[in-house]
């Protein structure tokens, strides 16, 4: 089991999702998530954490995303400490994801 998470680019995150079925956890606030988020992202909050644990296997890769790639590091480390084996944080966060032209779902 890893003792820490790995920082990856938005494109590396997309490759993990496409090739290995990684779960992308968006930790931004509910309003921002509702407005736009990465395609098929799980909205991870304190309230949804139990459902997250029910739906995600500890052996599967988990990618954490925030606004700019800063606060996702703390959540990624928390998930490592909870026993998740492969945890990643997206450098640049949702801003980087969007700038990279990767798929998003929007309310507009």
Swiss-Prot record:
GO biological process per UniProt: glycerol metabolic process
Q: Which GO terms describe its molecular function?
A: thiosulfate-cyanide sulfurtransferase activity
Q: Which residues form the Rhodanese domain?
A: 18-106
UniProt keyword annotations, A-Z: Cytoplasm, Transferase
Where in the cell? Answer: Cytoplasm
Please verify whether the record's keywords include Membrane. no
> What family does the entry list?
Belongs to the GlpE family.
Identify this protein by name: Thiosulfate sulfurtransferase GlpE
In the record, what lineage is assigned to the organism producing the protein? Bacteria, Pseudomonadati, Pseudomonadota, Gammaproteobacteria, Pasteurellales
């Amino acid at each position: 089991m890893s003792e820490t998470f790995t920082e990856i680019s938005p494109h590396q995150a997309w490759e993990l999702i496409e090739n290995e079925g990684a779960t992308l956890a968006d930790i931004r606030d509910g309003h921002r998530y509702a407005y736009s988020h990465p395609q098929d992202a799980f909205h991870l909050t304190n309230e949804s954490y139990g459902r997250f644990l029910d739906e995600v296997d500890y052996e599967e890769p988990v990618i954490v995303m925030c606004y700019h790639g800063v606060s996702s590091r703390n959540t990624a480390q928390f998930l490592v400490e909870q026993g998740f084996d492969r945890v990643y944080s997206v450098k640049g966060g949702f801003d980087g994801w969007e700038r990279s032209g990767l798929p998003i779902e929007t309310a507009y």
